[in-house]
Every structure is written in structure tokens, then in C-alpha cells.
Regions:
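A polyanion-binding, active-site-adjacent surface
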Residues: 2, 6, 10-227
Length: 227
């Protein structure tokens, strides 16, 4: 199609997207039956070794203000063999202290959100766009996102999720592009090639935003029902 614009009827997603192969008719996926070309045949030892190597590379990053001001590297939580991977923005104070993503108030809300669709941390895998806490819990800058994005994409390639849930505008823009707004893109499926894998991507509001804007929780619930 000209200019890589997917024109679909008004009930479907309509965006200019970069490097995307297909935009779905916006229907819920059955996570129990979903399949794909990137079925992981990777052994437990191989995947754990690749993740450990990636973690070491992030630990050894140099000349990084985020790393210099942080207490801990926040790499991941959950099951790396899950079909579902969740990407947030970056660690907060509690995450920096414990070295795990989503363990503060936003994390407790995320747990409730997952429970509402019969999921928990044992059957999803969670990470962030940046792996060290931005000072004062600010949003990471474009430069910081750009520096950590290759690590994030490699992380996704290793895990090979069938479903990638992006929480918040930072995660959405890092993976899909800056031309898309979370309020317009949320709850809509995109088939996305990331490195050497293809996966089903959906975005929703970040739990921290939902705590500030509780009236938006009903929309997040609609998004989760798509999974």
C-alpha cells in the first residue's frame, strides 16, 4: 500500500505505522490458543543463559546517568517462558530498592489488573523500557530510551512472547513509534516484527496513570479483555 498506510474501515485501527506487517481486525485474542511463527524451541538453560548475558551487558553499561544515580538494576520479574510479556516505563523508588519491576503501588494495581483476567506474575513476564530508575521518578528522556532500546528489543527476542502488552506512552512509543498516541492506540492489536520475531502487540494505560486518573480504569479493563 502507498506510504505504508493501512486504511481499514472505521471500526478498525487506522494509523501510519512503521515496520508493521499487518493490522488486525480488532477482536480479542484467545491467549490459550494463540500460535505463531516464533514458537520457542529454546531450552531452559539456553534461555536463562541468554537472559543472564543480557543482564550482564546492561549492568556493564558505561557513562549512564541513570545507572550512576540508581541503587539496583531492575531487569525483570515473572516467567520468561510465558506467552505474555509486559513492558512498563521504568523503575520507581520501590523497584530501585528491590531490583524488581512493578513492586510499588502501581505494581499492586497491576497485580489486580492481571487477576481480573485470571493471570498473575507466575504466568507473565515483566520488564521496562529502561532498567535503571530515572531521578525523581521522571519519564526517561528520548536519549535514555534510545540507549536502552537495543537491550529491550534483544530482551523481547530472547523471551519470544506471543503477546506483548505495552503499558503507557513511553513503552508504546519505544516499540511502535512516536507518531502514535496512547489514548488512540490503546486496546487495538498490531502485528509487529521486533528483531527476528513477530508478535501481537496491544497497549493500555500505565497503572501509575490509572492511580492519578481512576476514571480511566474502565478503559484499561476493556483493553485487558482483549487478551
Amino acid at each position: 500500500m502507498k506510504k505504508n498506510i493501512y486504511k481499514i474501515n472505521k471500526n478498525r485501527l487506522y494509523h501510519k505505522l512503521i515496520n508493521n506487517k499487518l493490522v488486525y481486525d480488532n477482536k480479542a485474542l484467545n491467549r490459550y490458543k494463540i500460535d505463531g511463527n516464533n514458537i520457542s524451541t529454546m531450552s531452559t538453560n539456553v534461555k536463562e543463559s541468554l537472559l543472564s548475558d543480557l543482564k550482564d551487558k546492561i549492568k556493564s553499561i558505561r557513562n549512564c546517568e541513570l545507572k550512576k544515580n540508581a541503587t539496583n538494576l531492575v531487569f525483570s520479574d515473572g516467567n520468561p517462558f510465558s506467552k505474555i510479556m509486559i513492558i512498563g516505563e521504568g523503575p520507581g523508588a520501590n523497584e530501585d530498592k528491590e531490583g524488581k519491576p512493578f513492586v510499588g503501588r502501581a505494581g499492586k494495581l497491576l497485580d489486580k489488573m492481571l487477576e481480573s483476567i485470571k493471570l498473575n506474575r507466575k504466568n507473565v513476564y515483566i520488564s521496562n523500557v529502561v532498567n535503571f530508575r530515572p531521578p525523581q521518578n521522571r519519564k526517561p528522556t528520548d536519549e535514555e530510551i534510545g540507549r536502552y532500546l537495543p537491550f529491550l528489543k534483544k530482551h523481547i527476542e530472547i523471551v519470544k512472547p506471543k503477546i506483548l502488552l505495552l503499558l503507557g506512552s513511553t513503552a508504546l512509543n519505544a516499540i511502535i513509534g512516536n507518531e502514535i498516541v496512547i489514548s488512540k492506540a490503546r486496546g487495538k492489536w498490531i502485528y509487529k516484527k521486533i528483531g527476528d520475531i513477530e508478535t501481537n502487540v496491544i497497549a493500555s494505560f500505565h497503572p501509575a496513570f490509572l492511580m492519578r486518573q481512576p476514571d480511566q480504569k474502565k478503559y484499561a479493563w476493556e483493553d485487558l479483555k482483549m487478551i
